[in-house]
Amino acid sequence: MKEAVVIWAKRTPFGKYGGALRHLEPEALLLPLFQNLKQTFPEVMDQVDDVVLGNVVGNGGNVARKSLLEAGLNHRIPGITLDRQCGSGLESIIYACRMVQCEAGKVFIAGGVESTSRAPWKIKRPQSVYEMQLPQFFERASFAPEGQDPSMIEAAENVAQHYNISRNDQDLFAARSHRLVATHFNNGDINREIVPLTIKGALFDRDESLKPNLTEARLHRLRPILPNGTVTVGNSCMKNDGAGIALIMEKEMAVAMGIKWGMLYRDAVTTGVDPTLLGIGPVPAVSQLLKRQKLNIEDISAIELNEAFSSQVLASINELHLGLDKVNQWGGAIATGHPYSASGAALVARLLNLPNWQYGIATMGIGGGMGNAVLFEKWRQ
């Protein structure tokens, strides 16, 4: 079996829903990433075997194929778009690594893209031309059967109650996320994973959801979204627009090209959980992954866990017995935002640029009651 390495991973800055990137379709969000990749590795672009992208709320079609053509990649390169809800971007990278392992190709571009601002409205199709009722709009697709398909907020509250996560702890974690992201933007760390955009003549190079001066006191003053709840707009992620991609290739090829460092793909797990507790997906995914690789949680020195809600991150940390110092060391999606399919690629880009680790995991809870997790090992020649 061949070995797969991630040698490059970047993302755009993330825009707020209805914010600075609201006018950009998914293909336009991906364009600067493809351009940066072509400039960095021009010698491999004609050797790409496939482009694998996640996308959840787009307008259909094959975003991967359309975006690679719009970016000027060779028309002989195919594209495939995957949908595993918000885990789609991470799943696309896992898919590409496995394709390299089984010798189905040597070079893949994988990641995800999402424009919540440009997502089309969906309405129920009338069964007859004589129907007189007003159009019924769908806020989102159903993830599970009726009675097992809570809203994201309800699911986050379910997790908070089931795992005894307090409002105070959720707010403290949210403040930590904003504080860490602001710190690592200011010292230049996070800039290494970002390809800036030019929007209406102005440079857009920082996540729009970030609130660098957010304090615990301000978070404590926010009202819960649900009556008697603990989840607020402050201790949850926002809806966002953005993209992220990675370049994955066979290790032997990377060595022959003189590439000096990257991340070696070790293994990945995707599993299901109770849909009413969907945010807890990282717990069984990471547990199964460690068991398969005969590792302990103490062997993992960096974990990037998508921050959809403070409640599910804290529940996952507690259940996995993680040290907080290993988790989201530069902050996470509560501060940077969560553009669904792009988030998994962002976790991988963060791991690639994060220093001082040997084994690292990227993991996500997924709509419909799932979780995925991927294990990388730092690789240097």
Swiss-Prot record:
E.C. code: 2.3.1.-
Gene Ontology cellular component annotations, sorted alphabetically: cytoplasm
Top class in the EC scheme: transferase
The entry's keywords: Acyltransferase, Transferase
Catalytic-site annotation from UniProt: C86 (acyl-thioester intermediate), H338 (proton acceptor)
Family matches, as Pfam families: Thiolase_C, Thiolase_N
GO molecular function, one term: acetyl-CoA C-acyltransferase activity
Signal peptide start-end: none
Keyword flag Transferase: yes
GO biological process, one term: fatty acid beta-oxidation
Family: Belongs to the thiolase-like superfamily. Thiolase family.
Name of the protein: Putative acetyl-CoA C-acetyltransferase VraB
Species whose genome carries this gene: Staphylococcus haemolyticus (strain JCSC1435)
Lineage: Bacteria, Bacillati, Bacillota, Bacilli, Bacillales
